[in-house]
């Protein structure tokens, strides 16, 4: 079965073709970073309009890459949520219209299930069951995964997600959008020991996260420095390093707890923040001590992409799950509500 995947949940237009026997045949991605940079964040209306301009040309591009035609497509998977409602509707409308014209089925894919399954596209994918750390956009979650659609939420952020905290701290430091990679880059020049940032909610039982306090601590640190002599480049780098280390160590501590609590020995990390090099290093150290394994998607599949949507959609289409041709756009959609592919 050849599945066309369409990702338009936020500020990236991702298109891919996945075949059940041959694997990933082609994928392409257009990022709107430059479009939104002047605004310091994603402008939903601009995002939607840009998806309208890009989806069809990118579909043609992946078809050419794979050497197939529209008539070869067996089904279309598109991101149905969570995400920006206008952006979701663009992808859903194009998917439904094309499917109607071709006489093929569609399926709406959960964006976070796409991220969760992205490591399955690698050469040595993890086996079920495993613990998943999902760190993408407005989500920071720990999930027990026993199969596709078999998800148990172990913990999540009670306020800001890790990615949101990175973006907000980036603004405090005067860094460009998107903030996460910019903070990580600046942190490489900083002194991890200069400031003692808290590790939120690690002093109590449980697997939930909280990052709003770290955001406030960062702001207070910068304000105190400004009042006592000013903020120079060295101090900004030190703040970035200490903030990042606090976020990373907090997530590592929670992942260790999740592995011990579930008794599982496989951990996957997915979502945009999973590309963070420091987080990967610290998780690798942690799982070694736990005699466990950690898996990631390749960097290009950590951020939003069409390949993960095509793959996730294929898993459900292959067992007979289908959508109708109405456009499904669900800005808020709990992952644990998804049905198992076992029926």
Swiss-Prot record:
It is an enzyme of class 2 (transferase). Substrate binds at residues 134-138, 167, 180, 276. SUPFAM superfamilies: Actin-like ATPase domain. GO terms for biological process: tRNA threonylcarbamoyladenosine modification. It catalyses: L-threonylcarbamoyladenylate + adenosine(37) in tRNA = N(6)-L-threonylcarbamoyladenosine(37) in tRNA + AMP + H(+). Fe cation binds at residues 111, 115, 304. It is found in: Cytoplasm. One of its GO terms (molecular function) is N(6)-L-threonylcarbamoyladenine synthase activity. One of its GO terms (cellular component) is cytoplasm. Its main location: cytoplasm. Binds 1 Fe(2+) ion per subunit. It comes from the Bacteria. Keywords: Acyltransferase, Cytoplasm, Iron, Metal-binding, Transferase, tRNA processing. The keyword tRNA processing applies. Required for the formation of a threonylcarbamoyl group on adenosine at position 37 (t(6)A37) in tRNAs that read codons beginning with adenine. Is involved in the transfer of the threonylcarbamoyl moiety of threonylcarbamoyl-AMP (TC-AMP) to the N6 group of A37, together with TsaE and TsaB. TsaD likely plays a direct catalytic role in this reaction. HAMAP family: TsaD. Belongs to the KAE1 / TsaD family. This is tRNA N6-adenosine threonylcarbamoyltransferase. It comes from Hahella chejuensis (strain KCTC 2396).
